[in-house]
Curated annotation (Swiss-Prot):
Residues 298-324 are annotated as: Disordered. GO terms for biological process: mRNA splicing, via spliceosome. The keyword Protein biosynthesis does not apply. The keyword Ribosomal protein does not apply. Expressed in many brain regions, including cerebellum, thalamus and occipital, parietal and temporal lobes (at protein level). Also expressed in the spinal cord (at protein level). The gene is CWF19L1. This is CWF19-like protein 1. GO terms for cellular component: post-mRNA release spliceosomal complex. InterPro entries: Cwf19-like, Cwf19-like_C_dom-1, Cwf19-like_C_dom-2, HIT-like_sf. It comes from Homo sapiens (Human). Signal peptide: none annotated. It is linked to Spinocerebellar ataxia, autosomal recessive, 17: A form of spinocerebellar ataxia, a clinically and genetically heterogeneous group of cerebellar disorders. Patients show progressive incoordination of gait and often poor coordination of hands, speech and eye movements, due to degeneration of the cerebellum with variable involvement of the brainstem and spinal cord. GO terms for molecular function: RNA lariat debranching enzyme activator activity. Belongs to the CWF19 family. Keywords: Neurodegeneration.
Length: 538
């Protein structure tokens, strides 16, 4: 079965014209259906019109699509980007960060580099340096398995991009743009590369990433420069396209060459030779944004040098999770843990029966170390959390049950992923989703559906309070907690007449049983779960 393509929009310089942009996006979606993401390059903010931005910042208005933006290109707009590692600017609008790799739950890989080129030290807050470009290349290009990335986002054009290609109009690509971006594009081999800043639209003919008859065929790259939003000449500033992540594509299909493909504009331009030594110098530690894909089974955290922690000959010691300020009921090494409830132990996580559970097989996935929420987990812990979730889904499905997972990062000190089975005979996944949405509306809780190909780490920052629920279908609902939040909300929904029909069990304190009964349930669960226990494979 063919993989369903993602539908994306890319945009040039917004320059503070948010209403024009988002009204246009709404019109496109009304006509052509919803898109998954909007990617903005160039200047997102302008020098004026702060009043318009305030409406989005305060929630009076909301972007109609999950939007990711690059950072400042001048000193004037640095003030809008408070966190170099990326942050949420407004609801549905996220600043990616100065540089890094963004991987969606679909496997789509986007590399981003904010700012303009600077060869001076110290580097201004709105610029990138040769070291920044080198670190991005080393993150990916040092492994023999590397084939390229899906999308590259930069604000400046790459220098000499017009070589061997169609005319770029009034822009002289030999003088305009960044040689560092040219080098980055050469190394990363993006399938799509978007840029802006030149107030014009230019879609270059696709170029090849291999030398004919000397190298194996590789995919082609399409470079698209976009104009500024609302420009009077009506130059194109929005670009719609569909893409299947390259990791999911058949190799032969991926490397098919378009009929109008050209030579690589950078290979013979001398750009790589002239700056190669400069950008491939050793990289110092630097702040670099990483998004960990909760559905990326092989996800690994890369250091700012780009070396894979599992393959480096001199790996750094993994950073220990933060220590709890006092006794913690859920840190596995803590004497406060009720160890008779523990039913399975992995390398980074463990499984325990819930105390006062909604059912006899209501379990928790917990990190062994002290982490407060999913968004704070390291890559290796995320990977094992996902492994437990997938295994529990198979386990419960074999027993005729759905699997509902939720997290409440509010008034809790240690991550607890609640995993509650719901008999398939009781409810459909649509029933479960509707129950959450209905009860949220009744309690004036804004429960939003996360776009299918986003994950929670892209929406919530470490330390932010939130509630999050995930269904067997992969659908995810999210609420950003701003003030008060009912602590038992997740249980109340599942205990309601619409789902499990045990409303008297909405509070766990009313469901406690004796330690002997808990031990009996734990023994039974261990025995039933054993055929699915992936820890026995190690």
């Amino acid at each position: 079965m063919a993989q369903k393509p993602l539908r994306l929009l890319a945009c040039g310089d917004v320059e503070g014209k948010f209403d024009i942009l988002f009204n246009r996006v709404q019109a496109i979606q009304k006509k052509s259906g919803n898109f998954d993401l909007l990617l903005c390059v160039g200047n997102f903010f302008g020098s004026t019109q702060d009043a318009e931005w305030e409406e989005y910042k305060t929630g009076i208005k909301k972007a109609p699509i999950q939007t990711y933006v690059l950072g400042a290109n001048n000193q004037e707009t640095v003030k809008y980007f408070q966190d170099a590692d990326g942050c949420e600017l407004a609801e549905n609008i996220t600043y990616l960060g100065r540089k890094g790799i963004f991987t969606g739950s679909s496997g789509l890989q986007i590399v981003y580099l904010s700012g303009t080129e600077s060869l001076n030290e110290p580097v201004p807050g709105y610029s990138f340096s040769p070291k920044d470009v080198s670190s991005l290349r080393m993150m990916l290009c040092t492994t023999s398995q590397f084939k390229g990335v899906d999308i590259l986002l930069t604000s400046p054009w790459p220098k000499c991009v017009g070589n061997f290609g169609n005319s770029s109009g009034e822009v002289d690509t030999k003088k305009c743009g960044s040689a560092l971006v040219s080098s980055l594009a050469t190394g990363l081999k993006p399938r799509y590369h978007f840029a802006a800043l030149e107030k014009t639209y230019y879609e270059r003919l696709p170029y090849r990433n291999h030398i004919i008859l000397q190298e194996n065929a590789q995919h082609a790259t399409r470079f698209i420069a976009l104009a500024n939003v609302g420009n009077p000449e009506k130059k194109k500033y929005l670009y719609a396209f569909s893409i299947v992540p390259m990791k999911l594509m058949d190799a032969a299909e991926l490397v098919k060459q378009p009929p109008d493909v050209t030579e690589n504009p950078y290979r013979k331009s001398g750009q790589e030779a002239s700056i190669g030594k400069q950008i491939l110098a050793p990289v110092e530690e630097s702040a670099c944004q990483f998004f960990f894909d909760l559905n990326e089974k092989q996800g690994r955290k890369r250091s700012s040098t780009g070396r894979d922690s599992k393959s480096s000959p001199h790996p750094k010691q993994p950073r220990k999770p933060p220590q709890p300020p006092g006794p913690c009921w859920f840190c596995l090494a803590s004497p406060e843990v009720e160890k008779h409830l523990v039913v399975n132990i992995g390398t980074h996580c463990y499984l325990a029966l819930a105390k006062g559970g909604l059912s006899d097989d209501h379990v928790l996935i917990l990190p062994i170390g002290h982490y407060q929420s999913v968004v704070e987990l390291s890559a290796e812990v995320v990977e094992e959390v996902e492994k437990y979730k997938a295994t529990l889904r198979r386990f419960f499905k074999s027993r005729g049950k759905w699997c509902v997972v939720f997290e409440r990062n509010y008034k809790s000190h240690h991550l607890q992923l609640q995993v509650i089975p719901v008999p398939i005979s009781c409810s459909t996944t649509d029933d479960i989703k509707d129950a959450f949405i209905t009860q949220a509306q009744e309690q004036q809780i804004e429960l939003l559906e996360i776009p299918e190909h986003s994950d929670i780490k892209q929406i919530a920052q470490p330390g932010a309070a939130y509630f999050y629920v995930e269904l067997d279908t992969g659908e995810k609902l999210f609420h950003r907690i701003k003030k008060n939040f009912p602590l038992q909300f997740g249980r109340e929904v599942l205990a309601s007449e619409a789902i499990l029909n045990v409303p008297d069990k909405s509070d766990w304190r009313q469901c406690q049983i004796s330690k002997e009964d808990e031990e009996t349930l734990a023994r039974r669960f261990r025995k039933d779960f054993e055929p699915y226990d992936f820890t026995l494979d190690d």
